[in-house]
Amino acid sequence: MKTLIARHKAGEHIGICSVCSAHPLVIEAALAFDRNSTRKVLIEATSNQVNQFGGYTGMTPADFREFVFTIADKVGFARERIILGGDHLGPNCWQQENADAAMEKSVELVKEYVRAGFSKIHLDASMSCAGDPIPLAPETVAERAAVLCFAAESVATDCQREQLSYVIGTEVPVPGGEASAIQSVHITHVEDTANTLRTHQKAFIARGLTEALTRVIAIVVQPGVEFDHSNIIHYQPQEAQPLAQWIENTRMVYEAHSTDYQTRTAYWELVRDHFAILKVGPALTFALREAIFALAQIEQELIAPENRSGCLAVIEEVMLDEPQYWKKYYRTGFNDSLLDIRYSLSDRIRYYWPHSRIKNSVETMMVNLEGVDIPLGMISQYLPKQFERIQSGELSAIPHQLIMDKIYDVLRAYRYGCAE
């Protein structure tokens, strides 16, 4: 990460896409997409996905590392080209506890990530815990971030410290997208960004972390990009120019969250304006969902009724029976809920792919379709971009490859924006 940031600060148009997903097909796609390039791939886990208690994936940081490396070995991607990052590392998962208890868990969280070889650490202590004022004072946020940084430094080996980089910042959207409809978004003020940096510098120095400050590579701000279930707020470069100009006088770049669904031109403009780390998650699993839904429609027409997976019906049944991952985000009416379950840009389906019933139904669908020739006309109907690539000889009409290429469509836009 440090090398890439140095190249950007030297005037090169270069950025990096941060893949924030624990889905094996998304990770496989991210690695396979860049297998034949010289680029490194940044894959990040969030604190609610992966933590010392397992998170919602059931994986600790060490488990996640091995999970990613196993996929890398399978696709022939060199492990040393992978950068592992930890996102929202702080009290995010334990906000209902008092600050002392939440920070104690957060310290162990950060230590486990660093011990497991994660080298890009987002120190995010911005959320209020039980009994805290809302919002937290910037000084409190910075002091807690310094505690987390001290924890990271205390377990890092000399070799790890050479690679270790930190991201700071408090203006982070709700992990995974907005819960309600959005019409506009607040762009971070330069004064607030400067204050975030100033308070963190002061807190780090007070804890004897002067050297660690040199490892702070980025600050999280809101450049004016966001999405909810059916709306996307697109990047307006002119609105972010004060931020773009301010960061030029520092050693850092910006990290932009929730950049999903922007145009490829917007990604190029974001990187030009020093938002050099572009995080993406739901857009990748949304593309995966689109591919699976398309293949399910194809299966419906090609496979005998008694042999079909019933994949789409299984997904809806499971999500309606077990609504904990979408209930507080989606609309309440039955028809509206179904539309959101299927098509929301927030893509809460991503939490359900590991469910045994859904996983089994998708596997059945894939086996069914691997055993037949899919007519080109059906691929044109349901996966038109993939049809064009089949026609030009870039792609085969194999279900797994069709899913990969659908995810590649998202990655292609980021590659354009981050181009070396």
From Swiss-Prot:
Underlying gene: gatZ
Subunit structure: Forms a complex with GatY.
Swiss-Prot/TrEMBL keywords: Galactitol metabolism
Protein name (database record): D-tagatose-1,6-bisphosphate aldolase subunit GatZ
Pathway: Carbohydrate metabolism; D-tagatose 6-phosphate degradation; D-glyceraldehyde 3-phosphate and glycerone phosphate from D-tagatose 6-phosphate: step 2/2
UniProt GO cellular component terms: plasma membrane
Function recorded in the entry: Component of the tagatose-1,6-bisphosphate aldolase GatYZ that is required for full activity and stability of the Y subunit. Could have a chaperone-like function for the proper and stable folding of GatY. When expressed alone, GatZ does not show any aldolase activity. Is involved in the catabolism of galactitol.
UniProt keyword DNA-binding present: no
Superkingdom of origin organism: Bacteria
NCBIfam families for this protein: agaZ_gatZ, PRK15052.1
Pfam families from the UniProt entry: GatZ_KbaZ-like
PANTHER family: D-TAGATOSE-1,6-BISPHOSPHATE ALDOLASE SUBUNIT GATZ, N-ACETYLGALACTOSAMINE PERMEASE II COMPONENT-RELATED
Protein species of origin: Escherichia coli (strain SE11)
GO biological process, one term: D-tagatose 6-phosphate catabolic process
UniProt family annotation: Belongs to the GatZ/KbaZ family. GatZ subfamily.
